[in-house]
């Protein structure tokens, strides 16, 4: 289950755009071996709101493109498909029958800015940011160079499989 909450008014959000991002999320989960019903919240915000959230949660007082708030714990350098192969969850990890993976907070305003900066489509940039965030929800990180390489490789593999290119 993907819950979408549009909390901004600067960018128009069509059903087609929302449906596309939901499909991207579902595909990324499948590619990462999430084989049980799960729940992700996808929040659309503007630069000001993501700046506030970034400041409150990370003490970084600037806008960013996407924030990820995973609900599951992962050992260092481990991801979902390495840790939860036996679907070994506690009851607290669920909302009804759905495993709660976490929240994605996406600045659509920043996604548009970056699409122009990187000279590709707005849809491609939003798709990339959503895949990036899903991977964070599943334990991927990019603080260390080896982790960054691993995460970037998975992002590109997933986007390429979806035929989403620069």
Swiss-Prot record:
Alphabetized Pfam families for the sequence: YbeY (PF02130)
UniProt xrefs under PROSITE patterns: UPF0054
SUPFAM superfamilies: Metalloproteases ('zincins'), catalytic domain (SSF55486)
Major location (coarse): cytoplasm
Residues binding Zn(2+): 132, 136, 142
Record's GO cellular component terms: cytoplasm
Domain of life, source organism: Bacteria
Enzyme class: hydrolase
EC code(s) of this entry: 3.1.-.-
One BP annotation, GO: rRNA processing
4Fe-4S as UniProt keyword: no
The family this protein is said to belong to: Belongs to the endoribonuclease YbeY family.
Name under which the protein is recorded: Endoribonuclease YbeY
The organism of origin for this protein: Clostridium botulinum (strain Alaska E43 / Type E3)
Gene: ybeY
């Amino acid at each position: 289950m993907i819950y979408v909450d549009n909390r901004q008014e600067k960018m128009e959000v069509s059903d087609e755009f929302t449906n596309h991002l939901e499909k991207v999320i579902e595909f990324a989960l499948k590619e990462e071996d999430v084989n049980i019903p799960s729940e992700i919240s996808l929040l659309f915000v503007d630069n000001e709101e993501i700046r506030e959230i970034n400041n409150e949660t990370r003490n970084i007082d600037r806008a960013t493109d996407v924030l990820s708030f995973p609900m599951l714990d992962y050992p260092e350098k481990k991801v979902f498909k390495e840790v939860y192969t036996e679907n070994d969850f506690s009851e607290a990890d669920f909302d009804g029958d759905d495993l709660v993976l976490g929240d994605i907070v996406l600045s659509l305003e920043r996604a548009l800015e970056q699409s122009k900066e990187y000279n590709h489509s707005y849809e491609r940039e939003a798709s990339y940011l959503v895949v990036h965030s899903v991977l964070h929800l599943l334990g991927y990180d990019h603080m260390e160079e080896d982790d960054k390489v691993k995460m970037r490789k998975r992002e590109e593999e997933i986007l390429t499989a979806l035929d989403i290119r620069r």
